[in-house]
């Protein structure tokens, strides 16, 4: 009989081996990724669920504490990702049973990136489609294409201290302004609490760089990745007002200047809001790949996702998924 359970610290080595087999494309990073994950807080390990039989894992799902604002009201929840059940068990509905177990443990969960079959299961369990995230790619300066070949990731020390005397590079978490209120009262906006921000963007696992506007309190986070041997810059996360296009246009302009300063030809950005779509497309960005669905709680039915996307007021604003960039997805 297959058991569904929360794992313990002593089972971490077994979890690492299961992930090596399940996600071979992660290569030697598997242990580092899981170690990074469980280092977030004392309960991080127990928020990992597994399908287990006779001491062997056959499936998993990771949950993480998150919080969001909706209509200005703060609510705690969980984000889930890396849901997988071994292929041979799916015909026996083990995956659905596992998801039902997870729903009992984490009833108010959100997720993104699910494939078509998983989306059907989420919806069958009472969740709803709230929107989607699109991956955009823009060519900022073709002159740097040759110099970015085989260059690798860019170290934090190579980024400028300021951009246009407006954006300041944040060297440590203590320099960050407190993010205690939403930038957009009428949107679904995922919170950026201090514990999350310090763990996620001020770590030694990956060279994230944070820039902040001390006048407005807006910020953005960038990093570099290598795809097809070309180094690109990723606009990974940001917060700003979306009442109009101005604030995000300033962030995008700063990102373009930054890319030119460190000789990067390509910028990658995700969008879960129609306003951001418009700004990116007006700057000749191209949407590539399939839109990644955002799944959430049923009680927000009617609050948001419109298939024509003309007036979408329920949106992640903006949580760009690392999954787009060959890392773990986390919001």
Task: Spell out what each predicted region is.
Residues 1-4:
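Extreme N-terminal starter segment of soluble prokaryotic enzymes
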Residues 7, 11-55, 127-236:
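Amide-forming acyltransferase catalytic core, primarily the GNAT-like/NAT-type
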Residues 15, 42-44, 61-62, 75, ...:
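Contiguous, function-dense segments enriched for cysteine-driven chemistry
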Residues 31-41, 61-85:
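N-terminal/domain-start segments enriched in small and hydrophobic, helix-friendly residues
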Residues 40, 65, 108-160, 221-245, ...:
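Active-site/acyl-donor-binding loops of N-acyltransferases
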Residues 49, 59-61, 78, 83, ...:
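Conserved GNAT-family N-acetyltransferase fold
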Residues 74-87, 230-242:
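Conserved acetyl-CoA binding element of GNAT-fold acetyltransferases
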Residues 82-104, 245-257:
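Conserved acetyl-CoA-binding loop-helix of GNAT-fold acetyltransferases
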């Amino acid at each position: 009989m297959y058991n569904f359970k929360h794992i313990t610290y002593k089972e971490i080595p077994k979890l690492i081996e299961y992930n090596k087999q399940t996600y071979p494309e992660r290569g030697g990073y598997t242990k580092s990724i899981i170690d990074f994950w469980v280092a977030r807080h004392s309960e991080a390990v127990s928020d990992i669920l597994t399908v287990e039989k006779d001491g062997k894992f056959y499936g998993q799902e990771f949950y993480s504490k998150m919080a969001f604002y909706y209509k200005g009201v703060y609510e705690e929840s969980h984000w889930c990702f890396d849901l997988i059940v071994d292929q041979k068990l799916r015909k026996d509905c083990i995956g659905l049973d596992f998801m039902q177990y997870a729903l009992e443990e984490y009833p108010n969960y959100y997720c993104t990136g699910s494939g078509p079959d998983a989306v059907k299961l989420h919806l069958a369990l009472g969740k709803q489609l709230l929107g989607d995230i699109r991956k955009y790619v823009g060519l900022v300066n073709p002159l740097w294409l040759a110099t970015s070949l085989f260059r690798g990731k860019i170290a934090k020390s190579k980024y400028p201290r300021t951009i246009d005397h407006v954006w300041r590079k944040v060297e440590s978490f203590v320099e960050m302004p407190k993010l205690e209120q939403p930038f957009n009262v009428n949107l679904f906006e995922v919170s950026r609490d201090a514990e999350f921000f310090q763990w996620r963007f001020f770590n030694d696992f990956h060279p994230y760089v944070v820039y902040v506007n001390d006048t407005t309190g807006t910020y953005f986070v960038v990093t570099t990745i290598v795809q097809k041997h070309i180094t690109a810059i990723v606009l990974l996360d940001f917060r700003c007002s979306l009442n109009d296009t101005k604030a995000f246009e300033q962030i995008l302009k700063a990102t373009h200047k930054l890319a030119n300063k460190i000789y990067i030809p390509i910028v990658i950005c995700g969008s879960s809001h129609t306003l951001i779509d418009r700004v990116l497309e007006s700057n000749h960005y191209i949407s590539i790949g399939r839109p990644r669905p955002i799944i959430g709680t049923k009680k927000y039915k009617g609050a948001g996702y419109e298939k024509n996307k003309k007036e979408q007021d329920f949106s992640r604003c903006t949580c760009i998924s690392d999954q787009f960039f060959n890392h773990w997805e986390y919001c």
